[in-house]
């Protein structure tokens, strides 16, 4: 069978110029020009993998699941456990009740049980996946219909793509210890570490994020997020914007919007909330802690 590698351009399936070790390959795949190797992976049907350096599963892979991150309180002990079925309601619940030790342990126990139940024994690439011009994929689960083009590194990630709502990972992106939900796109040099990206989100144009969560239909470009809880429909479009230690939803960040979670000399221990529908104007600076009402 021939594989369509780009619109109107077909190549016959097969394996050419590639080193594979302990790999299961599905039907009608085209794998060629693998610079280093593919090691210990499961590959589905009708995949196109070309000009990729390394695809590998190593010992201790988590695929981004069970990772505890500190959202809002950057210096905290961790209040959200990231896993593939996380949603904004559960994440907010974990943050709100992080001081309730018994409840926190119960939630973590339930999530750990789910992670153990659903964790694959090695990295896998689903069916109808396209991976081209990519440097490194390690300990990652890439589900059906995903397209990865020109990425630099995916490490300990789960990409929850499906054929009806595919995920696109674009050029120069680095994604580590993170989960990306269906319909999302991570493009143009975006950098994610210890993050959860919900459905139909776009992170692009060099946006960098660490220990943050983004939920449905959020758009982030150029700026930076750290320990941020970005609920549905948040938008930030400017290079000079920093979202740190804040809880947002239906929020629009103006250019040069900045937040400070260092009050006095105690370190980054402060945080605040902008309730739904908030908008910050250009040059806004907020010193946490604060709570700002809706709209």
What is the role of each PLM region?
Residues 1-122, 127-128, 295:
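Terminal amphipathic alpha-helical/low-complexity segments used for targeting or macromolecular assembly
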Residues 16, 21-22, 26-27, 32-33, ...:
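Left-handed beta-helix
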